[in-house]
């Protein structure tokens, strides 16, 4: 390819046919070489830059059951601090009960198709309500994390019927520290306690949600409520938790006050206990509730190791991003060093809802972000923590490199054309005239040289003739 371009440059550079082809070909070859080499180098530079940028932006995918593909899940993984045994901000709910209430602003109440909840706790109660999320007045949607007969369970309703899921094998009212993780995707739900297997719940009438969601997009907006009512009459499971208004922690309002320790609550990206410790304006605290500066005393290195094994063996639902590996993923054994208090870092999630199937409020993703675990006192983050970078930015380096290479090549080509067009044409004409004169002289000389023998012969002949006449 390179040699072919050089030959083309040589042909373009030759002024005439065969006589001036040598000098013109050399100039054309040099001209082609002048812009081909920078073009190649610029292209390689752009590709290398784009490849390096592409390699720096990576996203991990963890897939669970295939039944959860109806909704894209933002994140559901235990962060590094929980895997290492750090409980986060901790509150003690004493005898008589207390309550921490978070209220969304009236104009910022989210409606979600997927919810994520995680919390650490220790208690000896057989009956209590830990966390409850309620929708606006009159809607009736709710989600409740509770203890019933010493077992942890979740009950929720998003417009159809109450759906319950419970871990019946784990006893959690033993005074030890436990971590519970709950996810909801439409009417589907999963629940996990510590390192126990994940419990999954798929209610009836929820198998055709994907097809119904596609069909729902083609239904005119004015007919949305009619279609929803018809689907509801047919027993279809609704999926959106509409207009979430309050998060109630402690269960005092429900008549089953919690007594014990609650740590590091996360709900759809909200670090509620951390916000309470910072005296957030949207949070109210009543009753016998106090903030403590250390993790639950009942937590031991054995429970830490259990949580680490749970993280390494568990993959809950489909995810599109994750935190970086921690000491547990690297296989380091649990240490017996004293554990310092950290910020809430059990779970950060962002519930998403690509399409709405209920005509009450437009579905809006909750305002949540991904938080990196930090050491106590606001020092540097734990080793292994990483920022989440979206996949859409992974091609930025490639595009910038290609554009820069193309611009550089165009500039070089324009400069070469400018130099080629403005070179000294007088010298070319002088050289051409000289060649022409010399060629003419040479050709005339050749003709003269060729004719000299014939003229000599004629003179000799005349001389002989004269001699003959003279002698005769």
UniProtKB/Swiss-Prot annotation:
Record topological domains on the Extracellular side: 51-396
SMART domains: 4.1m, LamG
Ranges in a coiled coil: none
Reported modifications of this chain: O-glycosylated; contains heparan sulfate. Heparan sulfate attachment is required for synapse development by mediating interactions with neuroligins.
Entry-listed glycosylation sites: 188, 350
Topology in the lipid bilayer: Single-pass type I membrane protein
Region (Essential for interaction with CBLN1): 205-234
Pfam families xref list: Laminin_G_2, Syndecan
Region annotation (Disordered) ranges: 353-385, 439-472
Residue numbers of Phosphoserine PTMs: 454-455, 458
Residues that bind Ca(2+): 141, 158, 240, 242
Signal peptide: 1-50
GO molecular function: calcium-dependent protein binding; cell adhesion molecule binding; metal ion binding; neuroligin family protein binding; signaling receptor binding; transmembrane signaling receptor activity; type 1 fibroblast growth factor receptor binding
Keywords from the named record: Angiogenesis, Calcium, Cell adhesion, Cell membrane, Cell projection, Glycoprotein, Heparan sulfate, Membrane, Metal-binding, Phosphoprotein, Proteoglycan, Repeat, Signal, Synapse, Transmembrane, Transmembrane helix
TM annotation in the entry: 397-417
Record carries keyword Transferase: no
Subcellular location as annotated: Presynaptic cell membrane
SUPFAM superfamilies named in the record: Concanavalin A-like lectins/glucanases
Domain of life from the UniProt record: Eukaryota
GO cellular component, one term: plasma membrane
Entry's family note: Belongs to the neurexin family.
Protein role: Neuronal cell surface protein involved in cell recognition and cell adhesion by forming intracellular junctions through binding to neuroligins. Plays a role in formation of synaptic junctions. Functions as part of a trans-synaptic complex by binding to cerebellins and postsynaptic GRID1. This interaction helps regulate the activity of NMDA and AMPA receptors at hippocampal synapses without affecting synapse formation. NRXN1B-CBLN2-GRID1 complex transduce presynaptic signals into postsynaptic NMDAR response.
Subunit structure: The cytoplasmic C-terminal region binds to CASK. Binds NLGN1, NLGN2 and NLGN3, DAG1 (alpha-dystroglycan) and alpha-latrotoxin. Binding to neuroligins is calcium-dependent, and the binding preference ranks as follow: NLGN1 > NLGN4 >> NLGN3 > NLGN2. Interacts with CBLN2 and more weakly with CBLN4. Interacts with CBLN1; interaction is CBLN1 hexamer form-dependent; CBLN1-binding is calcium-independent; isoform 1b does not interact with CBLN1. Interacts with CLSTN3.
Protein name, UniProt field: Neurexin-1-beta
Organism: Homo sapiens
Encoding gene per record: NRXN1
């Amino acid at each position: 390819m390179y040699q072919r371009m050089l030959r083309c440059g040589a042909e373009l550079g030759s002024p005439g046919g065969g006589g001036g082809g040598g000098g013109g070909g050399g100039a054309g070859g040099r001209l082609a070489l002048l812009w081909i080499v920078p073009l190649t180098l610029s292209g390689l530079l752009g590709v290398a830059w784009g490849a390096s940028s592409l390699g720096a932006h990576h996203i991990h995918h963890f897939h669970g059951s295939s039944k959860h593909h109806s909704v894209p899940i933002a994140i559901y993984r235990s962060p590094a601090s929980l895997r290492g045994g750090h409980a986060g901000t901790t509150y003690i709910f004493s005898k008589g009960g207390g309550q921490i209430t978070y209220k969304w602003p009236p104009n910022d109440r989210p409606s979600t198709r997927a919810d994520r909840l995680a919390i650490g706790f220790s208690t000896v109660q057989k009956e209590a309500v830990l966390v409850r999320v309620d929708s606006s007045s009159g809607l009736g949607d709710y989600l409740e994390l509770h203890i019933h007969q010493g077992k942890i369970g979740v009950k929720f309703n998003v417009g159809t019927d109450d759906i319950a899921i419970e871990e019946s094998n784990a006893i959690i009212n033993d005074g030890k520290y436990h971590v519970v993780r709950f996810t909801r995707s439409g009417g589907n739900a999963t629940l996990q306690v510590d390192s126990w297997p994940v419990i999954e719940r798929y209610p009836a009438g929820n198998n055709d949600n994907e097809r119904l969601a596609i069909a729902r997009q083609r239904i005119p907006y004015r007919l949305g409520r009619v279609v929803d009512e018809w689907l509801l009459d047919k027993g279809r499971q609704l999926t959106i938790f509409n207009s979430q208004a309050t998060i109630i922690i402690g269960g005092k309002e429900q008549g089953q006050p919690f007594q014990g320790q609650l740590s590091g609550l996360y709900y759809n990206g909200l670090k509620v206990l951390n916000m309470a410790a910072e005296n957030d304006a949207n949070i109210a605290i009543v009753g016998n509730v106090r903030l403590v500066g250390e993790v639950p005393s009942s937590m031991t290195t054995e429970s830490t190791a259990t949580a680490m094994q749970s993280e390494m063996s568990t993959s809950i639902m489909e995810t599109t991003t994750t935190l970086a590996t921690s000491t547990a993923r690297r296989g380091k054994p649990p240490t017996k060093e004293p554990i310092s208090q950290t910020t809430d870092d059990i779970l950060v999630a962002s519930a998403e809802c690509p399409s709405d199937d209920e005509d009450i409020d437009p579905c809006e993703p909750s305002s949540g972000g991904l938080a990196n675990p930090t050491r106590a006192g606001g020092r540097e983050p734990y080793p292994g923590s990483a920022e989440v970078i979206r996949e859409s930015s992974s091609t930025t380096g490639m595009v910038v490199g290609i554009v820069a290479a193309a611009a550089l090549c165009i500039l070089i080509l324009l400069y070469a054309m400018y130099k080629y067009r403005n070179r000294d044409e007088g010298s070319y004409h002088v050289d051409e005239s000289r060649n022409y004169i010399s060629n003419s002289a040479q050709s005339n000389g050749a003709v003269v040289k060729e004719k000299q023998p014939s003229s000599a012969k004629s003179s000799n002949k005349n001389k002989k003739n004269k001699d003959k006449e003279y002698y005769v």
